[in-house]
Amino acid sequence: MKVKMSKLIILSGPSGVGKGTIESLLLKNKNLLIKLAISATTREKRRDEINGVNYFFLTVQEFKEKIENDEFIEWSCHFNNYYGTLKSQIKFIQSQNFIPLLEIDTTGAKNIIENYKNKGELSQLLTIFILPPSIESLKNRIQKRLTETNIQINQRLEKAKAEIKVKNLFKFQVVNDNLEKCVAQIEKIISKEIQKT
């Protein structure tokens, strides 16, 4: 498969839509030649997360220093926590002849899309937005995680409604109503798109 290593794949969608599960299944497909660009965050580490595997966990001061040093391809702050993708992660993955996969929120995705558009490099992005079948199903998924209070769940749902409104900024939109079908559809999109020169 002929692949252009400067490509960048963005997988985005509201919290609770299943991005993490989809991403882990995509990464198991070695034919896609993709690797996850691990994000950095200042949020508290969940009990099952590992630093450098799930996220790079940074202090607020460390994160702000990296912002000042222009070390992020994108970053955002929501729910009082910073999230971002380090440029060094992208370069490292590309140096290994893989295509970076970014699983990020819509704010970060919009920032990257705008940046690439301004540089005339939009063709280097493959943007995929994951949609829930409904807001009610999204609420159920978030509640099942047992990591948020009711107030936090409601905040996430309001944010999700706003995020869904920007779905048309993404080249592809895929509804996650059946995990296997959703992953198969995304695999097909990636396989087709990364072969384009």
Swiss-Prot record:
Keyword annotations of the record: ATP-binding, Cytoplasm, Kinase, Nucleotide-binding, Transferase
A GO-annotated cellular component: cytosol
Gene3D superfamilies: Guanylate Kinase phosphate binding domain (3.30.63.10), P-loop containing nucleotide triphosphate hydrolases (3.40.50.300)
Top-level EC class: transferase
Family annotation (Pfam families): Guanylate_kin
Gene Ontology MF terms: ATP binding; guanylate kinase activity
SMART domains according to UniProt: GuKc
Primary site of residence: cytoplasm
Domain Guanylate kinase-like intervals: 6-191
Reactions catalysed: GMP + ATP = GDP + ADP
EC id: 2.7.4.8
UniProt superkingdom: Bacteria
Residues that bind ATP: G13, P14, S15, G16, V17, G18, K19, G20
UniProt entry tagged with the keyword Phosphoprotein: no
Key word Ribonucleoprotein present: no
Places the protein is found: Cytoplasm
Function: Essential for recycling GMP and indirectly, cGMP.
Family to which the UniProt record says this protein belongs: Belongs to the guanylate kinase family.
Protein name: Guanylate kinase
